[in-house]
Amino acid sequence: MITEINDIFTEINDLLMRKISVARAFSHLLPLTSHLFISLLLLSSCGLRKQTATGDNAVSAQPVGPAFCADSAYAFCEAQCDFGPRTMNSQAHDDCGAWIMEKFKSYGMSVTPQQTLLKGYDGTMLRATNIIASYRPELTDRILICAHWDSRPWADNDPDEANHRKPVLAANDGASGVAVMLELARLLREYGGAGARGHEDTSAADTSRATSVSDSILAPPHLRTPAPPLTLGVDFICFDAEDWGTPQWDDTPSDGDTWALGAQYWAANPHVDGYTARYGILLDMVGGQGAQFYQEQQSLHYARSIVDKVWRASQVVGFGSFFPSREGVGITDDHLPVNRVAKIPCIDIIPYYPDCPQSSFGPTWHTVNDDMAHIDRNTLQAVGQTLIQVLWSE
């Protein structure tokens, strides 16, 4: 091997001396240049072997698209929490909804508020607003990304029973999914290609902190594969009234239909007649500390190929540890009416904590501790960059 490397070294030196006359002035650097070139060849061959092993995925197995800014998503999450708990029929709910719509508009999205009255489990009439923000609404080829934006009115899973009737701030269970969608909307406006209509605001939500987590994980921009402009539309839907499901302290029988009320309404009454999309991705609790996203059972049942697509994308961008190839449990969530009624294959990116005694959804689920102190930029980054990979790979 040493002899072969020396032969290669000699050939490279000879080639450089013959072809690059200016190199004569820097001949003392040639051995270093040659060794560097050989090292790059060896590294390249390792990369080729890895690509060959992945077969058909080799062509797409490179990070594409812009870097997701976790600091910006974190600030979007915090901004929602600053309104207080966004419980149904509250002023905080109305004010935050208006802010979300204006923020999407500022990133050039076409925004459609879908307002309706929905009946809660206890007969309470809920003033609900599904918020639909569309990138390039003129295109018929579309992808749906969704999350719920309301807060749980009761911390009924809190370890302290005295908190069970207090509202949840919902930093993770509500705000985190919307925050990721807002940052995606900002990046679509800036990098998506054909511009969206509306006001223009390409600034990140928060630039006061140091560089984004992505800078330490992803390849530098000049080493990443450039992506062509998107040729499809994207719809961001903020579903309302997801978390008004029957509380644990209430004995009223429930079959699961008291949850995801806004998604149920939209699926039966889409904002566009005959609306369809290639697929949908639901983001639920995507900012928690220590989160891992197992493959949810209903997602595997209705949209296994989309699960495979998203989990592969997480590996490509270096976040496979957040998306283990393990099966979780089945969840009653907004993706069910999207699958069953709207007939759009939709998956649920939702955490699974198999060893957490408080809840398999994590220690802060439906407790007063679901606040910004328990939001992790790394989790936001993992989910956001994975979605960038999915969108820019289409």
Which residues does each predicted region cover?
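C-terminal motif of bacterial Sec signal peptides marking the signal peptidase cleavage site
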Residues: S44-S45
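Second-shell loop/turn segments in exported
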Residues: Q62-A67, D82-Q91, L118-Y121, N163-G174, ...
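Catalytic-core environment of secreted peptidases
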Residues: A70-F76, F83, Y107, T129-R189, ...
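A non-catalytic alpha/beta surface segment that caps or lines the substrate-entry region
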Residues: E78-A79, P85-E138
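Solvent-exposed loop/turn segments at secondary-structure junctions
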Residues: T87-M88, L117-G120, P137-L139, W149-P153, ...
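N-terminal capping segment at the start of a domain
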Residues: Q51-C96, Y107, P357, F361-H374
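Active-site-adjacent substrate-binding region
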Residues: Q115, M125, Y279, V286-E394
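Acidic/histidine-rich catalytic neighborhood of metal-dependent amide-processing enzymes
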Residues: R165-T207, D215-A219, A227-S305
